[in-house]
UniProtKB/Swiss-Prot annotation:
Species for this entry: Saccharomyces cerevisiae (strain Zymaflore VL3)
UniProt keyword annotation of Cytoplasm present: yes
Stated name of the protein: Spindle pole component 29
GO molecular function, one term: structural constituent of cytoskeleton
A GO cellular component entry from the record: cytoplasm
Chain residue ranges for the region called Disordered: 1-20, 31-123, 210-231
Ranges annotated as biased composition (Basic and acidic residues): 69-91, 211-231
Subcellular location: Nucleus; Cytoplasm, Cytoskeleton, Microtubule organizing center, Spindle pole body
Its biological purpose: Component of the spindle pole body (SPB) required for the proper execution of spindle pole body (SPB) duplication. Links the central plaque component SPC42 to the inner plaque component SPC110.
Keyword Glycosyltransferase tagged: no
Post-translational modification: MPS1-mediated phosphorylation at Thr-240 is required for spindle pole body duplication.
Family annotation (InterPro entries): Spc29
Biased segments, Polar residues type: 1-12
Source species taxonomy: Eukaryota, Fungi, Dikarya, Ascomycota, Saccharomycotina
Length: 253
């Protein structure tokens, strides 16, 4: 017995047996595949199993898998199908990924994230949205400025009208005051509003003809009885109703 070559011959025989067995199994598998899928002489081709219509365009493994196989559906993702369909139809604008994915390094991104990052950027979308908000605010500011300008025009018109009315009233009062002063110098009778020429409102009280207005007792002792000067107005002794009556009578006169 050859002990020196026993190990080599045993290992070589095992390798040959294994190679022959694998080759035989491979030939049987190829023969089975030819009989089931690639034999044009059989009339039962495709009667038992329904294959995809695009099997010529697909890979050999997909070509051998029937449509009703559930394992193939589990492996493929519906998002991948949607992406392929959108890319095939030319609609490459996909919704943006979550904002947290932009903080990741580029090596960890998948192809889908890269496509999304190229086609639609949330930064660009936010920029457009903020620009729209700024434009709306500018339009609103212009609208408010227009309202303020219109209100200012109305206020200016009212101010000019009030100024004209004040000047008209002051002119009419000054004319009446001159006439009243001329009549007071001759008849010492009161008519119209008292002016500074007749009753001056100064520090220390009322003044009448540049003299302080005193009480009725002082006036009586100096100027005589009250009946002699019935047309004079004694504001300190008269009541409010009497003053109003005197003023109304002076207006009518």
């Amino acid at each position: 017995m050859d002990y020196x070559n026993f190990g080599n011959s045993a290992s070589k025989k095992f390798q040959d047996d294994t190679l022959n067995r694998v080759r035989k199994e491979h030939e049987e598998a190829l023969k089975k595949l030819r009989e089931e899928n690639f034999s044009s002489n059989t009339s039962e081709l495709g009667n038992k199993k329904h294959y995809r219509a695009q099997e010529r365009m697909s890979s050999p493994l997909h070509r051998l898998s029937p449509t009703g196989k559930s394992d193939d559906r589990k492996v493929k993702s519906p998002l991948d199908d949607k992406l392929r369909r959108q890319l095939r139809e030319g609609n490459t604008r996909l919704p943006p990924p979550p904002f947290s994915s932009y903080g990741m390094p580029p090596t960890n991104r998948s192809n889908l994230d890269r496509i999304r990052r190229r086609t639609s950027s949330p930064v660009r979308t936010d920029k457009f949205a903020s620009q729209n908000v700024i434009d709306d605010q500018r339009l609103e500011i212009k609208y408010l400025e227009r309202i303020v300008y219109d209100q200012g025009t109305v206020i200016d018109n009212l101010t000019s009208r009030i100024t004209r009315l004040e000047s008209f009233i002051l002119n009419s009062i000054s004319d009446r005051g001159d006439k009243n002063f001329a009549s007071l110098e001759h008849s010492r009778s009161f008519s119209g509003f008292p002016t500074n020429k007749t009753y001056g409102l100064q520090m220390g009280g009322l003044y009448e003809n540049d003299m302080p207005y005193r009480r009725s007792s002082d006036n009586i002792n100096k100027e005589g009885a009250r009946e002699d000067r019935s047309s004079q107005i004694h504001i300190e002794n008269e009541s409010t109703e009497d003053i109003l009556k005197i003023l109304s009578s002076s207006f009518h006169n």
